[in-house]
């Protein structure tokens, strides 16, 4: 027997070190992980056997067995699934193969208490065995192959892989050599209870050997949970299925179990988590809903079963209308799958709309966790934009709470027809922005957008139910203007611009190319000035984001709006009327201040500092 000794990847070593020294109280999850892996192995072979029946020749009844050998201090888990060859053992057990495990590593903080909490949150598969075992032996034979291989490790940095002449049928056997301090897991009654609690939803029969090791007792019903009538499933069974499926420690917030009958037949058992999922904004944006066809697991990767913006969903979809032998490639552009996706999307958005109306406090928590992902759908080419906007909520500047667009519209001031928003990084900073002081003074609400995605979706969705969605940074906002007064106000605006032409020309002449235009503001009430952009221009925050991402090279010149009622601006204007044009430093300081308030860079920080010092010096002398 040739034996090779290998070192674990550094990443695996980190996980094993945490498992071995774990203080995590719920160590029994190792059985959940190993049973889940065994079930997956059976599901994979069941799928492959649809196109190659020889893979299951002589043994087509899938099963998992669990046995306790108390005398030798061992727990033995056996399945007759796909099995592994030498390369599989090295790849699956010696390296990081699962993105969830990689994400687990990234989340480690170095704080042992917090890191042990993560074990339950992520589920780290096979490696959790080392929480209770000081040695693990894996014997496996891959379906369709003759060779048997043995993998063994004490979890201390190295493992061995060897060929074996052992008589062994297809599948995998895992022997856990239980630590002395964890010998309570060798108690038949306790282990039987653990296996039963984690296995009832597993579609593969799970058998438990009696204490004599002779008779097998089936512990689970071996029927997929989603195939049972809802009336026969308890809330606890739903919760356990969700936790096992999702490697989660939280309970689901919403459970959706539906059987769709008609032109397209499918069953869905879907969950919305109550806590934020760790991989929600992972670059690959993976979706975590498993596709089954007639109870046979097909895939949970690279299939367009749910839209990306609903990737927080967990669960299964089981179709009756797709052929079992369909290739994963064929699933990419499949009309039946597209109809299932549309039906699920409609159902989920409908459920969210109902929750938003019935349980606003709970919905606020959901939105804090998943609102950012949901709004990504507003940037996609989908027919669901209005339905998505119906379930969106935003921070109200006027009422300091989360409200929907429909609530915003219901509270329109007389003559108002536009939905106003302001985007930025921090809601508290936005509340003190000059951009919205005039609107708020007239009790016109402004929605505060603080997610990066907000700057993108507003470029795709300029209206909601015929009402324009408009940034408060736009130049043509007049807080006094109403529908009934618009004609008169337009005349007044022209008169105001003419009256203050001396002022605006002076600012433009002083600032030159730093500004595009200088205008008299119709939205400022106390601040001296603010930056603004025209309706045709890119939003200020969006432009800044694209510069940071190196999508565009330089910032464009903005408009500068002046408040003639402000004492500083009034003083400059009066000086101009008296033919005093010695306020250039003050004009530059006002512009720099407007840039700072808008998060824009100051062109010359040295000059800005000098101007500020000069003004302070004059004030105190």
Swiss-Prot record:
SMART domains: HATPase_c. It is found in: Cytoplasm. Pfam families: HATPase_c_3, HSP90. GO terms for molecular function: ATP binding; ATP hydrolysis activity; ATP-dependent protein folding chaperone; unfolded protein binding. Residues 545-621 are annotated as: C. Its main location: cytoplasm. Residues 1-328 are annotated as: A. PROSITE patterns: HSP90. Residues 329-544 are annotated as: B. The keyword Protein transport does not apply. CDD domains: HATPase_Hsp90-like. GO terms for cellular component: cytoplasm. Coiled coil: none annotated. InterPro entries: HATPase_C_sf, Heat_shock_protein_90_CS, HSP90_C, Hsp90_fam, Hsp90_N, Ribosomal_Su5_D2-typ_SF. Residues 475-494 are annotated as: Disordered. Keywords: ATP-binding, Chaperone, Cytoplasm, Nucleotide-binding, Stress response. Belongs to the heat shock protein 90 family. Molecular chaperone. Has ATPase activity. Homodimer. PANTHER family: HEAT SHOCK PROTEIN 90 FAMILY MEMBER. This is Chaperone protein HtpG. The lineage of its organism: Bacteria, Pseudomonadati, Pseudomonadota, Alphaproteobacteria, Rickettsiales. The gene is htpG.
């Amino acid at each position: 027997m040739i034996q090779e000794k290998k070192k674990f990847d550094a990443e695996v070593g980190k996980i094993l070190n945490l498992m071995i020294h774990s203080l995590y109280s719920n160590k029994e999850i190792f059985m959940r992980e190993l049973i889940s892996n065994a079930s997956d192995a059976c599901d994979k072979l069941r799928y492959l056997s649809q196109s190659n029946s020889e893979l299951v020749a002589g043994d087509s009844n899938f099963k998992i067995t669990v046995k306790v050998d108390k005398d030798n201090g061992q727990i033995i888990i056996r399945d007759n699934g796909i099995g592994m060859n030498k390369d599989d053992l090295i790849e699956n057990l010696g390296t990081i193969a699962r993105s969830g495990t990689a994400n687990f590593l990234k989340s480690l903080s170095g704080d042992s208490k917090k890191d042990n909490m993560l074990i339950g949150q992520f589920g780290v598969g096979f490696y959790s065995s080392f929480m209770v075992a000081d040695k693990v032996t894996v014997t496996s034979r891959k379906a369709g192959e003759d060779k048997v291989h043995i993998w063994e490790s004490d979890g201390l940095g190295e493992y061995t892989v060897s060929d074996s002449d052992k008589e062994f049928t297809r599948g995998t056997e895992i022997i856990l050599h239980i630590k002395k301090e964890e010998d309570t897991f060798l108690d038949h009654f306790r282990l039987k209870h653990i296996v039963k609690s984690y296995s009832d939803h597993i579609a593969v029969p799970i058998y438990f050997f009696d204490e004599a090791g002779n008779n097998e007792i089936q512990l689970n019903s071996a029927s997929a949970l989603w195939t049972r009538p809802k009336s026969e499933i308890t809330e606890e069974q739903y919760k356990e299925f969700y936790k096992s499926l999702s490697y989660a420690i939280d309970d689901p917030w919403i459970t959706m179990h539906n059987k769709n009958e008609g032109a397209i037949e499918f069953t869905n058992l879907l969950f919305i988590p109550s806590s934020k999922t760790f991989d929600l904004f992972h670059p690959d944006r993976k979706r975590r809903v498993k596709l089954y066809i007639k109870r046979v697991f097909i895939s949970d990767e690279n299939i367009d079963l749910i839209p990306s913006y609903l990737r927080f969903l967990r669960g299964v979809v089981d179709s009756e209308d797709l052929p079992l032998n369909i290739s994963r490639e064929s699933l990419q552009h499949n009309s039946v799958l597209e109809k299932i996706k549309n039906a699920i999307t409609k159902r989920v958005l409908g459920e969210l709309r109902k929750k938003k109306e019935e349980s606003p406090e709970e919905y606020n928590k959901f939105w804090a966790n998943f609102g950012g992902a949901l709004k990504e759908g507003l940037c996609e080419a989908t027919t669901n934009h209005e339905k998505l906007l119906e379930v969106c909520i935003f921070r109200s500047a006027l009422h300091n709470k989360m409200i929907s667009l429909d609530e915003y519209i219901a509270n329109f001031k007389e003559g108002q027809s536009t939905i106003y928003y302001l985007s930025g990084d921090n809601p508290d900073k936005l509340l003190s922005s000059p951009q919205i002081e005039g609107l708020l003074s007239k009790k016109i609400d402004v929605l505060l957008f603080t997610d990066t995605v907000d700057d993108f979706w507003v470029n795709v969705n300029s209206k909601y139910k015929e009402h324009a969605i408009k940034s408060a940074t736009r130049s043509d906002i007049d807080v006094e203007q109403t529908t009934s007064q618009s004609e008169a106000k337009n005349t007044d605006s022209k008169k105001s611009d003419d009256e203050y032409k001396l002022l605006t020309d002076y600012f433009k002449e002083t600032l030159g190319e730093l500004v595009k235009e200088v205008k008299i503001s119709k939205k400022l009430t106390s601040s001296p000035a603010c930056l603004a952009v025209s309706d045709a221009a890119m939003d200020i925050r969006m432009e800044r984001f694209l510069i940071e991402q190196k999508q565009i090279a330089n910032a464009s010149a903005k408009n500068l709006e002046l408040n003639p009622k402000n004492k500083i601006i009034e003083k400059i204007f009066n000086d101009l009327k008296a033919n005093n044009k010695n306020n250039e430093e003050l004009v530059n300081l006002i512009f720099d201040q407007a840039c700072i308030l808008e998060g824009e860079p100051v062109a010359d920080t040295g000059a800005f500092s000098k101007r500020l010092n000069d003004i302070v010096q004059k004030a105190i002398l």
